[in-house]
Amino acid sequence: MNSKESPFQFEKADDSSGFLLWQVTNLWQRGIKKALEKHELTHSQFVLLASVHWLTLAKQSVTQVLLSSHTKIDPMSTSTVLRSLQEKGLLKRQEHETDTRAKTVSLTDKGITLVNQAVKTVEQYDDEFFSPLAKESKDFNKKLVALLSRKLESE
């Protein structure tokens, strides 16, 4: 596309990293959504459940603020999703022992059972989806972390 009227800097759409990332993200999210249907979880619910479990296994005191920071989900959405998970009996939210403004989050036995099953499902899907990267996946992940780090520094 070399027209003087064109606002695009790229000859082909496939030369645009942003457009490619958008396409890949949509494709991946559609697959994740389908994979999680059998667990009756949305992607956000899964990410928060898995993060509570991950942080708990790392011996961290899990708060809503920590979860929001860890997942990059805004605090209001984090609170809304956690409330829905609490209503499903998958987690508990309690007053923090020392900070009365904070809430700690922990999984119930039902939540632990479900997240263990769902993690296997998602990891199987990820393995299949990202298999074309094969040996390059570690380098790919490092580049994604670099993009995340750069974005966080500018905020």
Question: Where are each of the predicted segments found?
Answer:
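Solvent-exposed, non-membrane alpha-helical residues enriched in polar/charged side chains
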Residues: 33, 37, 68, 112, ...
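Charged, amphipathic alpha-helical coiled-coil/dimerization segments
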Residues: 3-4, 83-142
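C-terminal regulatory/oligomerization modules of transcriptional regulators
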Residues: 1-10, 59, 135-155
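N-terminal helix-turn-helix DNA-binding core of bacterial DNA-binding proteins
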Residues: 30-74
